[in-house]
């Protein structure tokens, strides 16, 4: 089975803002942790990085720093609220995506949130493919 984690972020000449950069580092930690624990269970963990152009960002700044797990936004998995906060010069006057988790603001998506959401996705996969008579491998 496959677990897909997709991350969208602003890229200007190959560079991004500090918030997205830190999220990228956290995502790599989460992906490595998930691979370590899920590979022996038969899961392939796939990480996709999508770079948004400045034009994409101008049209919809909330797309930057989105994290998708198996086609569903991270905040939907963990019950977080999307909000916006000022960011940096790279982002100009646009406010950037942030999450409110348990009434705490998180501008950088932390590895533990990604792992939590990913494990919820894995549990849903295992449940959805099993029946009373058989289960998927």
From Swiss-Prot:
Cited Pfam families: DUF2703
Domain of life, source organism: Archaea
Name the record gives this protein: Uncharacterized protein AF_1295
Source species: Archaeoglobus fulgidus (strain ATCC 49558 / DSM 4304 / JCM 9628 / NBRC 100126 / VC-16)
Origin organism lineage: Archaea, Methanobacteriati, Methanobacteriota, Archaeoglobi, Archaeoglobales
